[in-house]
């Protein structure tokens, strides 16, 4: 029998391999990835500085260690050029050499790529993105060379705010730019976003909102950058970091005939429309929902591992709050499903506030907890929210 093949060595790929091995220690398992296959937890990148973690301390294991630990054949630095669903084969390329890899079941754990803005100027190619440990290593190396520690971050979403807090906490001057009028504008009601912003500003982070970057130019013999904004303002930075969001990596799947929308479309069994092809992680749009967070990956991996072991199992999405790593403004969010209309009910405390999202049936559908006092209600509130994808027997 041909092996089960996982494309991707991120958290989704490795978590699935680990869960599968708990259930089936023998079936041949192959992982294919374009990078070096080092296993690490990507969420740790946005607070590694304040945790005194150097890039070399972040990995959990290299390809050799993971291959031994999980009884897994790893084809690193290998590109999947095409999927042939009819023959159950992949066309691979490494160092200019093409090979064919057969599969019995194929799992797409290909993640998401950073969104890149079209920005003018001779400094635009120097803008950092951090979507991998390799990216992060380059960012930290550049950061260590800089004298004035002025960092401009493009994007006031989750990752932008987490990096801003981490950098500010370690002595950097941080300015965050976003087209939205408030940070975390897609996740938070306006009044909570305002309070969140105020807390971060009190810690020393600067926000320039309702505008965007038009140009990044090298100045001072290439040592610094002039960041020109659409509102006419110019900022001087030692480093520019882009954190404006991620786009699920759907091209490989799409070319193979897999149905895609924002992500790779799957049902609650994580099956795509093509036989024996599955998707998990940041690339997977499960029952019409994209959830690029850690807990959904864990739920997906456990369910799919069982299915691949012969026990058909639907993924179960309970209410899964997201803890935002911004100690200057402790925040937990349970996002409201996109198709649900809600009214927000707010309770204020000395150190923050709590907001509940109530739908037209008087059911709690989400919440936001800002500050330590509100944060204590996380477990109680989570139990009141209906499952996003109910458990199936």
Curated annotation (Swiss-Prot):
FAD binds at residues 9-12, 33-34, 42, 80, 162, 282, 294, 325. GO terms for molecular function: rubredoxin-NAD+ reductase activity. It is found in: Cytoplasm. It is an enzyme of class 1 (oxidoreductase). It catalyses: 2 reduced [rubredoxin] + NAD(+) + H(+) = 2 oxidized [rubredoxin] + NADH. InterPro entries: FAD-bd_OxRdtase (IPR050260), FAD/NAD-bd_sf (IPR036188), FAD/NAD-binding_dom (IPR023753), Rbx-bd (IPR041364). Its EC number is 1.18.1.1. Induction: Constitutively expressed. Pathway: Hydrocarbon metabolism; alkane degradation. One of its GO terms (biological process) is alkane catabolic process. It comes from the Bacteria. Its cofactor is FAD. GO terms for cellular component: cytoplasm. Keywords: Cytoplasm, FAD, Flavoprotein, NAD, Oxidoreductase. Pfam families: Pyr_redox_2, Rbx_binding. Gene3D superfamilies: 3.30.390.120, FAD/NAD(P)-binding domain (3.50.50.60). The keyword Oxidoreductase applies. Its main location: cytoplasm. Homodimer. Belongs to the FAD-dependent oxidoreductase family. Involved in the hydrocarbon hydroxylating system, which transfers electrons from NADH to rubredoxin reductase and then through rubredoxin to alkane 1 monooxygenase. This is Rubredoxin-NAD(+) reductase.
């Amino acid at each position: 029998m041909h092996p089960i093949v996982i494309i991707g060595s991120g958290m989704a790929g490795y978590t699935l391999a680990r869960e599968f091995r708990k259930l089936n220690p023998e079936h041949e398992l192959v992982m294919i990835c374009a990078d070096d296959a080092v296993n690490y937890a990507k969420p740790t990148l946005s607070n590694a500085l304040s945790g005194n973690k150097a890039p070399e301390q972040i990995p959990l294991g290299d390809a050799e260690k993971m291959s031994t630990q999980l009884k897994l054949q790893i084809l690193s630095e290998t590109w999947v050029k095409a999927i042939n669903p009819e023959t159950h084969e992949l066309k691979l390329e490494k160092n200019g050499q093409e090979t064919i890899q057969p599969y019995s079941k194929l799992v797409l754990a290909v993640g998401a790529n950073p969104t890149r803005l079209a920005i003018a100027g001779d400094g635009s190619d120097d803008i950092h993105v951090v979507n991998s440990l390799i990216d992060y290593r380059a960012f930290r190396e550049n950061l260590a060379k800089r004298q004035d520690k002025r960092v401009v971050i493009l994007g006031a979403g989750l990752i932008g705010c987490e990096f801003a807090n981490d950098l500010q906490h370690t002595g950097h001057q941080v300015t965050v730019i976003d087209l939205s009028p408030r940070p975390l504008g897609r996740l938070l009601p306006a009044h909570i976003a305002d309070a969140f912003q105020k807390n971060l500003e009190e810690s020393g982070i600067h926000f320039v909102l309702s505008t965007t970057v038009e140009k990044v130019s090298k100045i001072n013999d290439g040592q610094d950058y002039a960041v020109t904004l659409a509102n006419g303002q110019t900022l001087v930075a030692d480093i520019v970091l882009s954190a404006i969001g991620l786009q699920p990596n759907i091209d490989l799947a799409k070319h193979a005939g897999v149905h895609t929308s924002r992500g790779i479309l799957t049902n609650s069994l994580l099956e795509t429309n093509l036989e024996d092809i599955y998707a998990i992680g940041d690339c997977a749009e499960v029952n019409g929902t994209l959830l690029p967070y850690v807990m959904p990956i864990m739920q997906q991996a456990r369910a799919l591992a069982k299915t691949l072991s012969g026990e058909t199992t639907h993924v179960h999405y309970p209410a899964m709050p997201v803890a935002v790593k911004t100690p200057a403004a402790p925040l937990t969010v349970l996002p409201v499903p996109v198709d649900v209309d809600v009214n927000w009910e707010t309770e204020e405390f000395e150190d923050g506030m709590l907001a509940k999202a109530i739908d037209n049936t008087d059911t709690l559908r989400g919440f936001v907890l800002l500050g330590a006092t509100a944060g204590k209600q996380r477990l109680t509130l989570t139990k009141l929210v209906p499952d996003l994808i109910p458990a199936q027997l």
